[in-house]
């Protein structure tokens, strides 16, 4: 089961979503615009369900909003759905970091200096925007920062306008302090490099995102496969479901996707 727990700072309770539906696929669409091209692809999936019994759940992630908070509404990421397929046409996507591994994330307090409790043997990253850090080990980057004055702190994401994943490369026993300008930034601890579910990532040509920000492990799940359009991605879903490329040709020939 994919684990992505969101914790609120200062709150011990964890909420889990129960979902008894059984799906074949969890389909994630991250798009800059959900227009006619998405509607055509969605119509094709409806026909697949009607004619061939494909069971699926669709999760729509808007690229101009926080992907991590949107993921929490996607039940099939957390239930027993065996396979996840992801499509994006957003070049700055962080979905490979967020979905391709198992992570535990805590919401950072807004405009408040926060000192997290961290495990120096673990890997961490920030998912957010406009977050500053002050390392408490003076031998590290951030030497000279005033722990009480955030204007002297290092900007982790200077110049980037959207929420995204940012690696924290150095973790020592001295720890660090964080300051988040906005209320939807998270500190995430990587629990496992390999997901328990089967996951495949697809990106629209000319909009292939960068690699996982931590990249401590490289596997088939961390490779973006390139497709021409979102409709071509739908054809790949058919191949994945039936395990036979000739199935796509038969479906196109008989026009249930058209």
Swiss-Prot record:
A Pfam short name: Rotavirus_VP7
GO cellular component: host cell rough endoplasmic reticulum membrane; membrane; T=13 icosahedral viral capsid; viral outer capsid
InterPro entries per record: Rotavirus_VP7
Species this chain originates from: Rotavirus X (isolate RVX/Human/Bangladesh/NADRV-B219/2002/GXP[X])
Protein name per the record: Outer capsid glycoprotein VP7
Alphabetical UniProt keywords: Calcium, Capsid protein, Glycoprotein, Host endoplasmic reticulum, Host membrane, Membrane, Outer capsid protein, T=13 icosahedral capsid protein, Transmembrane, Transmembrane helix, Virion
Function: Outer capsid protein involved in attachment and possibly entry into the host epithelial cell. It is subsequently lost, together with VP4, following virus entry into the host cell. The outer layer contains 780 copies of VP7, grouped as 260 trimers. Rotavirus attachment and entry into the host cell probably involves multiple sequential contacts between the outer capsid proteins VP4 and VP7, and the cell receptors.
Topology versus the membrane: Single-pass membrane protein
Phylogenetic classification of the source organism: Viruses, Riboviria, Orthornavirae, Duplornaviricota, Resentoviricetes
């Amino acid at each position: 089961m994919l684990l992505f727990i969101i914790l609120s700072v200062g709150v011990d309770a964890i909420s889990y979503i129960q979902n008894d539906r059984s799906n074949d696929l969890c389909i994630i669409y991250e798009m800059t615009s959900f227009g006619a091209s998405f509607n055509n692809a969605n119509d094709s999936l409806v026909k697949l369900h009607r004619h061939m019994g494909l069971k699926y759940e669709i999760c729509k992630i808007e690229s101009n909003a926080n992907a991590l908070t949107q993921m929490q509404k996607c039940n099939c990421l957390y239930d027993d759905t065996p396979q996840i397929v992801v499509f994006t046409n957003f070049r700055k996507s962080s979905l490979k970091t967020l979905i391709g591994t198992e992570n535990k994330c805590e919401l950072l307090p807004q405009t408040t200096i926060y000192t997290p409790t961290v495990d120096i043997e673990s890997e961490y990253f920030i998912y957010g925007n406009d977050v500053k850090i002050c390392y408490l080990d003076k031998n590290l980057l951030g030497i000279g920062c005033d722990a009480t004055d955030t204007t002297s702190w290092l900007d982790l994401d200077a110049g980037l306008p959207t929420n995204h994943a940012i690696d924290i490369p150095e973790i020592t026993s001295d720890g660090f302090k964080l300051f988040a300008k906005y209320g939807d930034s998270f500190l995430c601890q990587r629990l496992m490099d390999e997901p328990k579910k089967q996951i495949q990532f697809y990106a629209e040509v000319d909009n292939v995102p960068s690699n996982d920000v931590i990249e401590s492990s490289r596997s088939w799940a961390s490779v973006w496969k390139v497709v021409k359009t979102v409709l071509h991605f739908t054809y790949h879903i058919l191949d994945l479901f039936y395990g036979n490329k000739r199935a796509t040709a038969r479906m196109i020939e008989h026009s249930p996707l058209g």
